[in-house]
């Protein structure tokens, strides 16, 4: 026993104050007594002082690791992971980079604006804007032309009124509608080409108004025709039975919709597609309307200022490279014009499709406010044209694309026909006000058909979106320079050459 006690004491000397966790009796009891005497010296005569509880295991481990200096997990500081810019990392928060892009864009444009002011001074002249609409203050051909459009609106109404009561046959009504709609296209064009006092800008506004009226009245004619066809089918099915109208007390049915009030509401409503019962908002929100009106005024002034201060000098400086056929300078002028042209186009989009159309819709309590969709996310040319101008897109689908399919055309022919109609109106709104026919706008629109195929075939995702943006940023300045160059040569350079 003495040997075992000596061995135990020597073991205690080697391990220091480390607590033994072995159980047992005999010599082990002596070790426990020695340990308790060392740890609890205050156990005295009374023996009633509580012994301190042993430290928890995790605390002892932590103390041991601190004293050693290196823990088990501190030996490893690397793990399997990808860099943030790698597609496999799953990281998507690039808000700081987006803010950096915005800051750089602001600084770059601020430098260009300062350079423009230093080079040209202040070119903004509100009085000059009036001269773009009127040559003679006593001759207002464009406003008079727009007022005269009421003749064709009334003619359409009278034709439909007589068709509803059977005073005209469908064939005669179709003939009268075709003549009326053709006159809507040809009459303002003839006035714009023959009347010398009308300005290009005034002619543009008049032709745009007549184009909108053409689309609206063609939709008005189609919907009323469909209502007559449905009425004939309903009579054949019901065999003269009257349908209860209790469920439709607040709706208008054909031919009760044939009133001047209904037609002129449609003429002023921000849509090209006619319905007998439009969705209506419950009230006019005055604050919303005031914001839209202020936006209209602000962005109108901003567009005029940017055109006069930024675009006009750039276009004027581009004429000499075009005359000399200096291709490097032409490309430089083209890229320089691309920035202000694209910025003005974006402002125009917001001004027209958000501010103006929402203001008109709020005044008329027109409920359908989907005037545009997320065209800026377009990954194809087709998606862009389907989403940037919803009123025109709805009209094309309803009154052009689907009727062509019903007549037996395939989808490719119908889609090409839609682009052809769009190309016609683009050329119509540009060539006639400028009084020259170069077909640049028509060619640019028809080029969208092969361009859409190329983008769909070779570009996907973000690359497709980038391709759409490139066509928007570069394509429009090319058309602008083409028309401005030809207009300049036709009106200013020809006498010098002669």
From Swiss-Prot:
Lumenal membrane side: 128-139, 194-200, 320-326, 432-439, 493-498
Chain sites annotated for binding an acyl-CoA: 385-393, 401, 415, 488
Involved pathway(s): Lipid metabolism; glycerolipid metabolism
GO biological process: diacylglycerol metabolic process; fatty acid homeostasis; glycerolipid metabolic process; insulin secretion; ketone body metabolic process; lipid storage; long-chain fatty-acyl-CoA metabolic process; monoacylglycerol biosynthetic process
Region (MBOAT fold): 140-498
Pfam families for the chain: MBOAT
Biased composition (Basic and acidic residues): 58-68
Annotated region described as Intracellular loop 2 (IL2), given as residue ranges: 365-410
Transmembrane segments: 93-127, 140-165, 171-193, 201-232, 285-319, 327-364, 411-431, 440-458, 461-492
Notes on the domains: The disordered N-terminal region is required for the diacylglycerol O-acyltransferase activity and may regulate enzymatic function via its interaction with the MBOAT fold.
Protein's UniProt name: Diacylglycerol O-acyltransferase 1
Gene name, Swiss-Prot/TrEMBL: Dgat1
């Amino acid at each position: 026993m003495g040997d075992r006690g000596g061995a135990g004491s020597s073991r205690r000397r080697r391990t220091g104050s480390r607590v033994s966790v072995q159980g047992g009796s005999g010599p082990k009891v002596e070790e426990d007594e020695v340990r308790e005497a060392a740890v609890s010296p205050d156990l005295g005569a009374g023996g009633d002082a509580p012994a301190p509880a042993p430290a928890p295991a995790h605390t002892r481990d932590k103390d041991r690791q601190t004293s050693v200096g290196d823990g088990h997990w501190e030996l490893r500081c690397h793990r399997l992971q990808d860099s943030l810019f790698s597609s496999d990392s799953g990281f998507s928060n690039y808000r700081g980079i987006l803010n950096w892009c915005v800051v750089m864009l602001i600084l770059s444009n601020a430098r260009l604006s300062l350079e423009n002011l230093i080079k040209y001074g202040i070119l903004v002249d509100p009085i000059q804007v009036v001269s773009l609409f009127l040559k003679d203050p006593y001759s207002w051909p464009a406003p008079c032309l727009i007022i005269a459009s009421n003749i064709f609106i009334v003619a359409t109404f009278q034709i439909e009124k007589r068709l509803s009561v059977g005073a005209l046959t469908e064939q005669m009504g179709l003939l009268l509608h075709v003549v009326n709609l053709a006159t809507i296209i040809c009459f303002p064009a003839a006035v714009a080409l023959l009347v010398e006092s009308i300005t290009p800008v005034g002619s543009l506004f008049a032709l745009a108004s007549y184009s909108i009226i053409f689309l609206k009245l063609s939709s008005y004619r189609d919907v009323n025709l469909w209502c007559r066809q449905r009425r004939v089918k309903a009579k054949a099915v019901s065999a003269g039975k009257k349908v209860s109208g209790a469920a439709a007390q607040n709706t208008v049915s054909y031919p009760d919709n044939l009133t001047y009030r209904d037609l002129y509401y449609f003429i002023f409503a921000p849509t090209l597609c006619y319905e007998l019962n439009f969705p209506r908002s419950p009230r006019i929100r005055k604050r919303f309307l005031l914001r839209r009106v202020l936006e209209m005024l602000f962005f109108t002034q901003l567009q005029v200022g940017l055109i006069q201060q930024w675009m006009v000098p750039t276009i004027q400086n581009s004429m000499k490279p075009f005359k000399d056929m200096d291709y490097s300078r032409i490309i430089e002028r083209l890229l320089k014009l691309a920035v202000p042209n694209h910025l003005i186009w974006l402002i125009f989009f917001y001004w027209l499709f958000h501010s103006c159309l929402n203001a008109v819709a709020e005044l008329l309590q027109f409920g359908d406010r989907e005037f545009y969709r997320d065209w800026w996310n377009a990954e194809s040319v087709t998606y862009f044209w389907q989403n940037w101008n919803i009123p025109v897109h709805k009209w094309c689908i309803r009154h052009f694309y689907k009727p062509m399919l019903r007549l037996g055309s395939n989808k490719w022919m119908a889609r090409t026909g839609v682009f052809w109609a769009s190309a016609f109106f683009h050329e119509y709104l540009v060539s006639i006000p400028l009084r020259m026919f170069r077909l640049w706008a028509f060619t640019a629109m028809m080029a969208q058909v092969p361009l859409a195929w190329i983008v769909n075939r070779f570009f996907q995702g973000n690359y497709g979106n980038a391709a759409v943006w490139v066509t928007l940023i570069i394509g429009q300045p090319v058309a602008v320079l083409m028309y401005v160059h030809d207009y300049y040569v036709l009106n200013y350079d020809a006498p010098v050459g002669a």
